[in-house]
Amino acid sequence: MVQKSGMSRGPYPPSQEIPMEVFDPSPQGKYSKRKGRFKRSDGSTSSDTTSNSFVRQGSAESYTSRPSDSDVSLEEDREALRKEAERQALAQLEKAKTKPVAFAVRTNVGYNPSPGDEVPVQGVAITFEPKDFLHIKEKYNNDWWIGRLVKEGCEVGFIPSPVKLDSLRLLQEQTLRQNRLSSSKSGDNSSSSLGDVVTGTRRPTPPASAKQKQKSTEHVPPYDVVPSMRPIILVGPSLKGYEVTDMMQKALFDFLKHRFDGRISITRVTADISLAKRSVLNNPSKHIIIERSNTRSSLAEVQSEIERIFELARTLQLVALDADTINHPAQLSKTSLAPIIVYIKITSPKVLQRLIKSRGKSQSKHLNVQIAASEKLAQCPPEMFDIILDENQLEDACEHLAEYLEAYWKATHPPSRTPPNPLLNRTMATAALAVSPAPVSNLQGPYLVSGDQPLDRATGEHASVHEYPGELGQPPGLYPSNHPPGRAGTLWALSRQDTFDADTPGSRNSVYTEPGDSCVDMETDPSEGPGPGDPAGGGTPPARQGSWEEEEDYEEEMTDNRNRGRNKARYCAEGGGPVLGRNKNELEGWGQGVYIR
């Protein structure tokens, strides 16, 4: 029994050692630390106290990384302000669609919007290339305008202002400069540049020329202000002031007058508008040089004509200029007019020689000058012209010109815009001309004429083309439906004096032949003595007098027939004779309808 009790008490001595170890704190702490340091289940070597501190530190970091209520509210306010500004910008953009065009610009740089440009409404910025035309409706802020690209199908959007474009250019140059500096720090660039210095070799010249180009482009403004409607100017086939050139250009002016009735203003410009270069007008020191030179026009007169052209273009009607002094597109390349250059081209020099010789000795003696001017125009690259009319038939050339101008009209008058009122446009054009120097307006057909000297009328004032319909014994502005025999090719109802009644003696009026000319007269020498049908001969042919009386009865009928398609201008023999060669004589049909009245 004692042994059993002794055996049952056997485990007590080790159990008695456990309390001794429990009451000894230092061995217990050291052992527990070692145990916690080397025998953690996760295999880490950090102690329990450090792990607890890490847990507490992590909870503090997670607490501080959370945005505060003030930060959240500030971000919401910014988003609300952005949405409100975008809503207002869209509303202003919608209102601008019905507003008139304030002014127009031609771009000298290109622009492709990027997300970092801070457009008022993302995705509504206008992309354009150099030499594009923009209609500006209004200013949105200092960085953005509201307008549209003058192109069919383009809508109103945001256009960067010159200030914005300059800032974008400076930012781009700064980025390029930083890229160059970073690339120059590389070992290859430094060693190559050092090798150039040591060996004494010179770098090629293109970098220097590139720097010069960069300096020259820095001073070019991003936009040039131009007329809201680009004026139409005819050049060729030779020099203005000579019969062949004037007759062909006059045929086109008369076609435009009737084809675009109510949508076009045609005006005579006698001042030398080639002097209206931006470098001249903006530099007062050059004014004295121009004034002292033997120029035809003074700078004040030129400036007045330019302002009048801008005023005409504000009505958004087509504007055609009969400019006496413009014979080459380079004359207007540095002006602010940005015209639509129409080149009347005669491909064969022999055809031009034949036309000049057919006008008589007075024109034949200036043959070399006219041929030289024609060759100079032919040497110009096609990019200098907007339209090249090289058709042999007048009808085809007119339709070619009409197609281009119809497309331009659609580009400048988008469908979203309120359709123009022709009567209102005519009134606006008349009001614009009222402030111009010595204008002549025509409300029956917006054929607007101006000159420098007053007419020798009883009133002493400029008058409309239709105010004196019986002065020359013919009603101007008609296309007769029936022509007497021998007049089937007649295209003109307006004489040169009626059309440009402000001309002075000795001007381009002398180009046009007398009423006695006929189709057969094209093959005769006009320098011969006056026939019985000429005013100097003391009489008027009965057929001519009767034809104008009959034409008055057909005025209403022909107002709806403005197209020249009914009157084909072909140079053919009278009396049903054989048609001459197409290359030479169908082209001469330009002159047949012009000279015969």
Curated annotation (Swiss-Prot):
Residues 54-71 have a biased composition (Polar residues). It comes from the Eukaryota. This is Voltage-dependent L-type calcium channel subunit beta-1. The lineage of its organism: Eukaryota, Metazoa, Chordata, Craniata, Vertebrata. SUPFAM superfamilies: P-loop containing nucleoside triphosphate hydrolases (SSF52540), SH3-domain (SSF50044). Gene3D superfamilies: P-loop containing nucleotide triphosphate hydrolases, SH3 Domains. Residues 548-558 have a biased composition (Acidic residues). One of its GO terms (cellular component) is voltage-gated calcium channel complex. Residues 100-169 form the SH3 domain. Regulatory subunit of L-type calcium channels that consist of a pore-forming alpha subunit and auxiliary beta, gamma and delta subunits. Interacts with CACNA1A, CACNA1B, CACNA1C and CACNA1S. Component of a calcium channel complex consisting of a pore-forming alpha subunit (CACNA1S) and the ancillary subunits CACNB1 or CACNB2, CACNG1 and CACNA2D1. Identified in a complex with CACNA1C. Identified in a complex with the L-type calcium channel subunits CACNA1C, CACNA2D1, CACNB1 and one of the gamma subunits (CACNG4, CACNG6, CACNG7, or CACNG8). Belongs to the calcium channel beta subunit family. Pfam families: Guanylate_kin, VGCC_beta4Aa_N. Signal peptide: none annotated. Detected in brain. It is found in: Cell membrane, Sarcolemma; Cell membrane. One of its GO terms (biological process) is cellular response to amyloid-beta. The keyword Repeat does not apply. Residues 43-53, 182-193 have a biased composition (Low complexity). It is a peripheral membrane protein. Regulatory subunit of L-type calcium channels. Regulates the activity of L-type calcium channels that contain CACNA1A as pore-forming subunit. Regulates the activity of L-type calcium channels that contain CACNA1C as pore-forming subunit and increases the presence of the channel complex at the cell membrane. Required for functional expression L-type calcium channels that contain CACNA1D as pore-forming subunit. Regulates the activity of L-type calcium channels that contain CACNA1B as pore-forming subunit. One of its GO terms (molecular function) is protein domain specific binding.
